[in-house]
Amino acid sequence: MEIRKALLIFSVLLITMMTFVFCGQTSVQNKNQMVRLAKLVIDSTQLENYNALLKEEIEASVRVEPGVLTLYAVAEKNNPTHITILEIYADTVAYKSHILTPHFIKYKNGTKDMVKSLELVETVPLVPGMKIK
């Protein structure tokens, strides 16, 4: 009976400790995340080509870079040349690594004459750790 009691207490303590450890790691990871918006205006005569290069870059980044958590691009419904990209990186190291990848460099070089304006907006998540389903 005493052994059962001791095992039960040990199990509860172990589960409690694991919860604190894993929740703490998640909290630290979320605090280190780099989240920003890239707001672009694209030359209307090159929009189709731009969208193709953007799609290729986003798909490659999310597929091969573990530090790229989200790249979600949207165009304004009534103004499709105005594009906003939600960028979420594990941390600034992941971002710095991302901009040195061959697929990002190909995107930047391929679109430099298509982009009329680019604004990078640094943000602070209001609900840190929120996952996109």
Regions found by a protein language model. Give the residues of each.
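Short hydrophobic/aromatic beta-strand micro-patches
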Residues: 41, 74, 86-88
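Generic structural signal for individual residues within well-ordered alpha-helical segments
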Residues: 7, 48-51, 96, 105
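N-terminal targeting signals for Sec/Tat export/insertion, comprising classic cleavable signal peptides
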Residues: 35-60
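Solvent-exposed loop/turn segments at secondary-structure junctions
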Residues: 45, 77-78, 90-94, 126-128
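An amphipathic, aromatic/His-enriched active-site/gating alpha helix that lines ligand/cofactor pockets
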Residues: 57-70, 88-122
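Glycine-rich beta-strand-turn "strand-cap" elements at beta-sheet edges
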Residues: 5-8, 14-35, 72-79, 108-133
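Short, glycine- and small/hydrophobic-rich beta-strand elements in well-ordered beta-sheets
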Residues: 24, 59-84
